[in-house]
Amino acid sequence: MESAGLEQLLRELLLPDTERIRRATEQLQIVLRAPAALPALCDLLASAADPQIRQFAAVLTRRRLNTRWRRLAAEQRESLKSLILTALQRETEHCVSLSLAQLSATIFRKEGLEAWPQLLQLLQHSTHSPHSPEREMGLLLLSVVVTSRPEAFQPHHRELLRLLNETLGEVGSPGLLFYSLRTLTTMAPYLSTEDVPLARMLVPKLIMAMQTLIPIDEAKACEALEALDELLESEVPVITPYLSEVLTFCLEVARNVALGNAIRIRILCCLTFLVKVKSKALLKNRLLPPLLHTLFPIVAAEPPPGQLDPEDQDSEEEELEIELMGETPKHFAVQVVDMLALHLPPEKLCPQLMPMLEEALRSESPYQRKAGLLVLAVLSDGAGDHIRQRLLPPLLQIVCKGLEDPSQVVRNAALFALGQFSENLQPHISSYSREVMPLLLAYLKSVPLGHTHHLAKACYALENFVENLGPKVQPYLPELMECMLQLLRNPSSPRAKELAVSALGAIATAAQASLLPYFPAIMEHLREFLLTGREDLQPVQIQSLETLGVLARAVGEPMRPLAEECCQLGLGLCDQVDDPDLRRCTYSLFAALSGLMGEGLAPHLEQITTLMLLSLRSTEGIVPQYDGSSSFLLFDDESDGEEEEELMDEDVEEEDDSEISGYSVENAFFDEKEDTCAAVGEISVNTSVAFLPYMESVFEEVFKLLECPHLNVRKAAHEALGQFCCALHKACQSCPSEPNTAGEERLGQAGGSWGGAGPDWCFSQ
């Protein structure tokens, strides 16, 4: 096809007409298989009048060359390299220049600097050009090719650092500054000790460049701040001599309310990281006071008139998690304080922080009082030991006072603080039940019907406090149960019922057998939720399954008569509802029931293990992420002949040239795998001999998860494998046989070296 015909097809793809795009895509897939397609694309990327067509042609050419570069004749490769560099020098549209630079980077990954000296010559000439547009093009090209293969430029680091020292001083050219910072971002992890003197010279200019970029383009400035992150993380000490200047710059941006939230949040993230990696230097240089004096006003900032902070709103339409979830500078400033508590000695942090806390808590402003409570909440994590030993009574008194504050925003913060104290200050906090429980119960009763967001905060604090009380919960059990059962009886929202069912689990954990008088009423409500077909009650169903598992462990023997019914309910829901949270809660229920039923669970093991194997094998929730210039994946539909030819090609193309830039995995699916491992391990031990027919297949799938990228899943897989060893040993003792004994020996040997033995070896006869 001539370039004019190809251009018309590309125009069709740019129209807002789905049907025409579909037809044009089908035609284009056919056209692009022809040998003449590549010359036509090259003609368009260099000479088409419409910049959109030039850009599209460059993207398609890059995609084409990505898998076919080695097939081209040497002359054609040299011609293409020359054409692309010429087009790049002539191009005036930024979007096209970027696509041409990315095309150059694709070729560079395959050729390298030695095989493409013209690229290096162009970079050297353009980046030192006296003409600003040409220089900006050179820096754009440099940033893209360095990012594509940074190790190739290590021999040129000194030359590049000298160049960046010049370009970062060009405060009148924002484009130059941005691409210089992008280049520095990529280089930073590869800097060596020899590079340090030149790299340190860039730090003041980096700050100046950021100060120039922020008023012009906050989005670009957010991206450019990655350079600061990388230098902070660098193994060589580049930032340290300029730590004070870097901190001053960050604090100036963070406190500037005239700037947008995005750039202030991004700079607060830099501060969080700075505290993590430079905490000792902060103390040594006495930089903690200015940091705290900047953070506190941000935490205490009032929202715009007539508005509330996200966590203080009571909207069921978009309910936030009980944790600090607002995307505002306030919440990220709290995270900086949290990081300070984690990485500074409390005897250094608390004396400077406590006077500010006391002043805030005495303030007439509810947002000042809220700030004090939020800071107390996060202090309980990093400075937990210090608080337990020296400060718990007075600080808990402050939190309890906050629960009775006239302002709802302060009460919300006090509930959050109490929940954090309950998580982080065990077991000491539980000894204050006489002071805390009456306040929590009074608060629960005061929440108006329908205010589920406030109820969620109360339940968060209640659950965290109650579940560790043990027998100390008994005096409060009648009142607690009346509150929870009332929520279940009333025509309240599904969210309110979900919160009540969750709280019942925490109460059961503490109360154990003392819960028996309330057991029939609880089961009546749970059975109702588990049998409902209402879609809006699905979260309540999931929570009911989780609470049912907790009840099975807490109540124990009295629940045995209901074990078979609970098992059937769980299996039925797994058949009806496709949801990872529902499955993981059901598996936890099965694990709890296995402790009651033992080998009595045998009739259901085939169905249970089948479900669990599907969860262990599932790749659901793993979503490929494509780079920003995806070209409709027009080359995915290649003929089998071409694929076979490519497989036989001696020059195997690099996998990282794919347009898939990474994968995202929804946390729910990792949680499902983690809980599946935990449940199947427990079931194997409790059901003993009955589990043996399923041991091999389950072992194989759990073994594969030792390579899972998610730490918690790997940990759960290791624990499950250990439980399989215990289960097989137990089965051999109760039912000795030659195959069982041999299997136990092999499993034990494999358990001693998971890294070297595979499941096939372990179970081979």
Q: For the regions a protein language model found, what residue spans apply to each?
A:
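Karyopherin-beta/Importin-beta family HEAT-repeat alpha-solenoid scaffold
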Residues: 1-765
